[in-house]
A protein has these predicted regions:
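Residues forming the flavin
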Residues: 1-37, 41, 131-291
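A ubiquitous short alpha-helical element
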Residues: 9-12, 58-64, 98, 205-206
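Ferredoxin-type iron-sulfur electron-transfer modules in oxidoreductases and energy-metabolism complexes
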Residues: 25-40, 52, 62-67, 71-106, ...
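Short, cysteine/histidine-rich loop/knuckle motifs that typically chelate Zn2+
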Residues: 48, 56, 68-71, 115-118
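Conserved phosphate/pyrophosphate-binding and hydrolysis machinery centered on Walker-type P-loop NTPases
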Residues: 59, 124, 231
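A broad detector of the eukaryotic-type serine/threonine protein kinase catalytic domain
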Residues: 74, 95, 99, 113, ...
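Glycine-centered loop/turn positions within well-structured domains
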Residues: 76, 88, 114, 254, ...
């Protein structure tokens, strides 16, 4: 358990937003982070409940709603480790259930916080921000790459089709097990919707690229601009690899048959986000022109 009286001593404190007059001038992430000392205080608010509803994802309505973490993250454990300053073990516990916490620590809607018992009598623990702190600190310390290196290679070759969150997660875990992994992506950059479907101010693309670079550094192969069925056939994949994992994502939009759908300027969201992000990444600056 963290501080037994932490939930009484400390108020909830979220990661602060950058000043408005600063953040309207660029496409950088909206939020900054707390100091290490402040982060430990936030972790101290976790009571390590006898039945921690935060860490167990419970689905309702046929899977349409969820309470608690769908990943079953070991939240009370790594909150206590943050409070104690044992950031290495906190990282190990976090990545036991979540291979890409730098993504979820930024864009997850955090149903864990809604399920936090502390929320019944005040504000829930800042689980979302605590998760981000653990993984960002781990990257700074150089722990992430080491955690993904296998002890030995199995000689088993696996192709992963698609480099979105599912494909990257699969590639990371398979590489840890010692298999030789190659990730195929039809786009010019890796990351899928992490790269092109989420605005930069929510998930800086440097964060996504950092993960890709880390994976490449520990032996995972990446092949861009390659569409299965056009540039390489499924039969060729099956000949070259022992197994093939399809993680193609959900890039095909669902249209709406409603009045006004064909009006000028009405576009699919992912198409719009992809174009704007590509323009941003291909430009020389992330700053906006003066108003």
């Amino acid at each position: 358990m963290a501080d037994p009286f932490g939930f009484l001593k400390y108020e909830r404190k979220d990661n602060p937003y950058r000043p408005v007059n600063e953040r309207i001038k660029d496409f950088e992430e909206l939020q900054t982070t707390l100091s290490v000392e402040e982060r430990q205080k936030q972790a101290a608010r976790c009571m390590n409940c006898g039945i921690p509803f935060c860490h167990e994802g419970t689905f309702y309505g046929g899977g349409r709603a969820v309470s608690g973490c769908p990943n079953d993250n070991l939240i009370p454990e790594w909150n206590a480790l943050i409070y104690k300053g044992d950031f290495r073990r906190a990282f190990e516990r976090l990545t036991r259930t979540n291979p890409l916490p730098e993504m979820t620590g930024r864009v997850c809607p955090a149903p864990c916080e809604k399920a936090c018992t502390e929320g019944l009598n005040g504000s829930g623990v800042t689980i979302h921000d605590n998760e981000r702190f653990i993984i960002d600190n781990a990257f700074e310390e150089g722990w992430v790459a080491d955690s993904g290196r296998p002890i030995e290679r199995t000689g088993f070759k696996v192709a992963v089709v698609g480099s979105g969150p599912a494909g990257l997660s699969a590639a990371w875990r398979l590489n840890q097990l010692g298999h030789s992994v190659t990730v195929f992506e039809r786009s010019d950059r890796f990351g899928g919707l992490l790269m092109y479907g989420i605005p930069n101010m929510k998930l800086d693309k440097k964060i996504v690229q950092r993960r890709i670079d880390t994976m490449a550094s520990i032996g995972i192969n990446f092949v861009a601009n390659t569409e299965i069925g056009r540039d390489i056939t499924a039969e060729e994949l099956l000949e070259k690899f022992d197994r093939v994992i399809l993680a193609t994502g959900a890039s095909v939009p669902r249209d709406l048959d409603i009045p006004g759908r064909d009006l000028k300027g009405i576009r699919f969201a992912v198409d719009f986000l992809t174009e704007t992000t590509k323009n941003l990444l291909d430009s020389d600056t992330h700053e906006l022109p003066p108003l």
